[in-house]
Amino acid sequence: MFDIGFWELVLIAIVALVVLGPERLPHAIRSVAKFVSAAKSMANSVKDELAHELKVQELQENLRKAEQMGMQNLSPELQKSVESLKQAAQEVQRPYAATPSSEASSTSSNPSSATEPDVRLDSASQPAEKKAE
């Protein structure tokens, strides 16, 4: 890493012993060792986070590609089931879409019951439409 040889390490140890003295040298060595281990752990943490982010980005790109390809690559059985789901969703929506004015006049005394089925129907049909797209 630093390309330091054995004799260079011995020279650094002798200089450190002379400068720091025998009382403070062990404490200084521990401090340097803690700093080096903290730096290594921080570098590994950053490396792991970058690898995780790259995996997430790759998965997002694959998802975008799959969405762009749409449902063209589906098997015929899946395409038939998607089409039947689309038709069922349209059939369910037709009666309610054609009669909101007649229901409003007949259920004007209880307005909460008139709006409740529409909310349920819309929320139930949205996932089918999203899947179909």
Swiss-Prot record:
It is a single-pass membrane protein. The keyword Membrane applies. The chain crosses the membrane at residues 1-21. Residues 67-133 are annotated as: Disordered. One of its GO terms (molecular function) is protein transmembrane transporter activity. One of its GO terms (biological process) is protein transport by the Tat complex. GO terms for cellular component: TAT protein transport complex. PANTHER family: SEC-INDEPENDENT PROTEIN TRANSLOCASE PROTEIN TATA, CHLOROPLASTIC. Part of the twin-arginine translocation (Tat) system that transports large folded proteins containing a characteristic twin-arginine motif in their signal peptide across membranes. Together with TatC, TatB is part of a receptor directly interacting with Tat signal peptides. TatB may form an oligomeric binding site that transiently accommodates folded Tat precursor proteins before their translocation. This is Sec-independent protein translocase protein TatB.
